[in-house]
């Protein structure tokens, strides 16, 4: 039995770790998301997430509720309708940077390398991607809660747009 167990453990250790998914509140829903003690609308509200909130690791789910990591060892539940599942990527472009292209493209029109550039992210920059909004090879980027860009006055600038998948690699 021990002889069989060791190779299985070794094989499992060699498998790549699955990248984590995270929750980010939908700022256009009602501006916030309640995190509850249990997966129902009658349970105690532990905290409220808003547009300034950073992403929270998704630990699991129960129906349409997501169990997320709060600070320390605390966890809570948030309804999936209150936000987005995001995945972390790193800009890793042969060109040294990746362009974030304009998100507002006419319905039915493809995003192309000729679409308006909103900003350019240097290699090594963490990029939050919302998979449900991807369009083919173009991944939907948001800096909500991370605010990696600043405006000319030094204030946080909210940017959303598309980055070609060839310019990114999955992180976490």
Which stretches of residues belong to each language-model region?
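Generic "edge-of-domain/loop-turn" microfeature
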Residues: 6, 40-42, 63, 73-75, ...
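Boundary regions of SH3-family modules and the immediately adjacent low-complexity/disordered segments
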Residues: 20-21, 69-95, 142-172
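Beta-loop motif signature
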Residues: 28-64, 93-135
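Sec/Tat signal peptide C-region and signal peptidase I cleavage site
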Residues: 15-19
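Peptidyl-prolyl cis-trans isomerase
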Residues: 139
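Sec-dependent N-terminal signal peptides
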Residues: 4-13
